[in-house]
């Protein structure tokens, strides 16, 4: 990979949207070829609007209330809102998909380590598996001395040093919804995310996490396979 221009990347405005849906059994019927073609065409067309579809993810069974998640990103939130609304209004899949959860985040430079760039923004390929969740820091966190927070974040980073295959996308979400941060881990194997998350529990920064649910986890999947598997 080419050397990253951290200044350029950190000056980039990039919004992310994670949208989770559920489908009622039987709504799609048995013949789904037209639904697949329409959905695939719709997602491809979003490129013309400046919207990147990073992936579709199968979350069925890992949650009882959801079937799939879409991750999109663009340089303005209106484009993401348009894709979200158009998907629900103009596609057969969208019309029978009930919203479960949707959150938006915006890339901003990391507070202490300007080289900490989200994987998607650094040009990395999407991972085979994803784990997305929001989190909210303790009330005390932002009032702690900079050096104390720097120390805890450094320790947190050191705990993850054995998981270089797990790529992080940690993105601020202040004022964009109910959370302060949205985090998406991508990895080639799901168990690597599980092991990393467990190890990160044993760090001081964990004491300053006030909220970190819901979790949406699953494999990246093609449009064809997703629609074929839906109930």
Swiss-Prot record:
Fe-coproporphyrin III acts both as a substrate and a redox cofactor. Keywords: Heme, Heme biosynthesis, Iron, Isopeptide bond, Metal-binding, Oxidoreductase, Ubl conjugation. The gene is chdC. It catalyses: Fe-coproporphyrin III + 2 H2O2 + 2 H(+) = heme b + 2 CO2 + 4 H2O; Fe-coproporphyrin III + H2O2 + H(+) = harderoheme III + CO2 + 2 H2O; harderoheme III + H2O2 + H(+) = heme b + CO2 + 2 H2O. This is Coproheme decarboxylase. It is an enzyme of class 1 (oxidoreductase). HAMAP family: Coproheme_decarbox_2 (MF_02244). The active site is at 133. Pathway: Porphyrin-containing compound metabolism; protoheme biosynthesis. SUPFAM superfamilies: Dimeric alpha+beta barrel. Its cofactor is Fe-coproporphyrin III. Fe-coproporphyrin III binds at residue 156. PANTHER family: COPROHEME DECARBOXYLASE, HEME-DEPENDENT PEROXIDASE YWFI-RELATED. One of its GO terms (molecular function) is metal ion binding. Its EC number is 1.3.98.5. Involved in coproporphyrin-dependent heme b biosynthesis. Catalyzes the decarboxylation of Fe-coproporphyrin III (coproheme) to heme b (protoheme IX), the last step of the pathway. The reaction occurs in a stepwise manner with a three-propionate intermediate. There is a cross-link at residue 44 (Isoglutamyl lysine isopeptide (Lys-Gln) (interchain with Q-Cter in protein Pup)). One of its GO terms (biological process) is heme B biosynthetic process. It holds the Pfam family Chlor_dismutase. The keyword Ligase does not apply. Belongs to the ChdC family. Type 2 subfamily.
């Amino acid at each position: 990979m080419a050397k990253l221009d951290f200044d350029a990347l950190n000056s980039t405005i990039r919004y992310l949207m994670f949208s989770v849906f559920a489908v009622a059994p039987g709504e799609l019927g048995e013949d789904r070829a037209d639904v697949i073609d329409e959905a695939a065409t719709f997602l491809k067309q979003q490129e013309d609007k400046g919207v990147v579809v990073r992936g579709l993810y199968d979350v069925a069974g890992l949650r009882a209330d959801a079937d799939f998640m879409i991750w999109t990103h663009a340089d303005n939130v209106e484009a993401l809102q348009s894709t979200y609304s158009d998907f629900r209004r103009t596609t057969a899949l969208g019309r029978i998909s009930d919203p479960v959860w949707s959150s938006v985040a915006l890339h901003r430079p990391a507070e202490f380590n300007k080289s900490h760039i989200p994987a998607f923004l650094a040009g990395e390929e999407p991972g085979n598996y994803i784990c997305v969740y929001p989190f909210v820091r303790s009330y005390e966190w932002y009032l702690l001395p900079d050096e104390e927070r720097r120390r805890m974040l450094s320790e947190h980073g050191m705990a993850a040093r054995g998981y270089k295959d797990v790529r992080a996308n940690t993105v601020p979400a202040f004022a964009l919804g109910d959370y302060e941060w949205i985090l998406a881990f991508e990895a080639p194997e799901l168990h690597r995310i599980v092991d990393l998350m467990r190890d990160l529990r044993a760090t001081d920064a964990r004491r300053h996490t006030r909220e970190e649910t819901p979790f949406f986890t699953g494999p990246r999947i093609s449009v064809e396979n997703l629609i074929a598997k839906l109930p």
